[in-house]
Amino acid sequence: MSAVAPDGRKMLRLEVRNSQTPIERKPEWIKTRAKMGPEYTKMQNLVKSEGLHTVCQEAGCPNIYECWEDREATFLIGGDQCTRRCDFCQIDTGKPEALDRDEPRRVGESVVTMDLNYATITGVARDDLPDGGAWLYAETVRQIHEQTAGREAGRTKVELLAPDFNAVPELLREVFESRPEVFAHNVETVPRIFKRIRPGFRYERSLKVITDARDFGLVTKSNLILGMGETREEISEALKQLHEAGCELITITQYLRPSVRHHPVERWVKPQEFVELKEEAEQIGFSGVMSGPLVRSSYRAGRLYGMAMEQRRSATV
């Protein structure tokens, strides 16, 4: 009898193999404290009363208290089905719904309603679309910028966490021309295990996307997830390669397994190693680094953007 995933489909062989390893027990340092400040409480009430949806609350992000206190939030676009499968990601792989061309406008309205200082837009890969979803990502940035142009506290800044669009120059250009304050593309892991963890992507292609974004003049960002089988030396090498590719901002985090169908946790990285990696990344030359067990790629995103801009200003003096 074939193993069946929760969504009713037949499980992939990789998922069956992953399922043979029970969910790992988290160490004591993988925990967070709820610090509900006044801005967080306002945001929580607003999201509930207006029926808004953010990745922050729907994914149970441990950093929601800090981010919402800073009036920062993350939105997922493109639907809930991805055309690629990464072995760490909880988003389902399958055939997406038809493109919702009104979604960018609605996301913009949500940003206005929440009065955000900084919005991170992420989404699924849409290889089913002729443009890979490039218009959708670009239009969402445009809508947020247009709808918040008259905001008293200043236009909402947008960070776009995008797929690679197969590194097609025309598609990347369309996205870049929407001028997000930050263009993020996450490599997530090191070259040796990249194909196993992210079979739909290519490491060198991801580096090229980051280089192209930097050459276009955008602030660039990426993320590394630790605990999926990489070595300490490989992390250091990946950091150097990312910086050489033009990456300015980096987040480094611990892999937390979403379910038994996903890649097992190979190791729990101790807090001290995250401290050491932060220092190493800063020495390599990254403008801003967030490194810790519960850091996520959108964690303190506005603060990291500020670090990049400060570094750029210093370089021109």
From Swiss-Prot:
Output the Gene Ontology terms for molecular function.
4 iron, 4 sulfur cluster binding; lipoate synthase activity; metal ion binding
Tell me which EC number(s) this protein carries: 2.8.1.8
Please give the Gene3D superfamilies that the UniProt record associates with this protein.
Aldolase class I
Q: Family assignment?
A: Belongs to the radical SAM superfamily. Lipoyl synthase family.
List localization entries.
Answer: Cytoplasm
Q: What is this protein called?
A: Lipoyl synthase
**What is the required cofactor set for this protein?**
[4Fe-4S] cluster
HAMAP family named in the record? Lipoyl_synth
Q: Which organism is it from?
A: Streptomyces coelicolor (strain ATCC BAA-471 / A3(2) / M145)
* Pathway of action: Protein modification; protein lipoylation via endogenous pathway; protein N(6)-(lipoyl)lysine from octanoyl-[acyl-carrier-protein]: step 2/2
Catalytic function, reaction form: [[Fe-S] cluster scaffold protein carrying a second [4Fe-4S](2+) cluster] + N(6)-octanoyl-L-lysyl-[protein] + 2 oxidized [2Fe-2S]-[ferredoxin] + 2 S-adenosyl-L-methionine + 4 H(+) = [[Fe-S] cluster scaffold protein] + N(6)-[(R)-dihydrolipoyl]-L-lysyl-[protein] + 4 Fe(3+) + 2 hydrogen sulfide + 2 5'-deoxyadenosine + 2 L-methionine + 2 reduced [2Fe-2S]-[ferredoxin]
Give an example GO cellular component term for this record. Answer: cytoplasm
**InterPro entries reported for this sequence:** Aldolase_TIM (IPR013785), Elp3/MiaA/NifB-like_rSAM (IPR006638), LIAS_N (IPR031691), Lipoyl_synth (IPR003698), rSAM (IPR007197)
**Enzyme class label:** transferase
Key word Membrane present: no
UniProt-annotated binding residues for [4Fe-4S] cluster 2: C82, C86, C89
Q: Transferase as a keyword?
A: yes
Checking PANTHER family in the record gives: LIPOYL SYNTHASE (PTHR10949), LIPOYL SYNTHASE, MITOCHONDRIAL (PTHR10949:SF0)
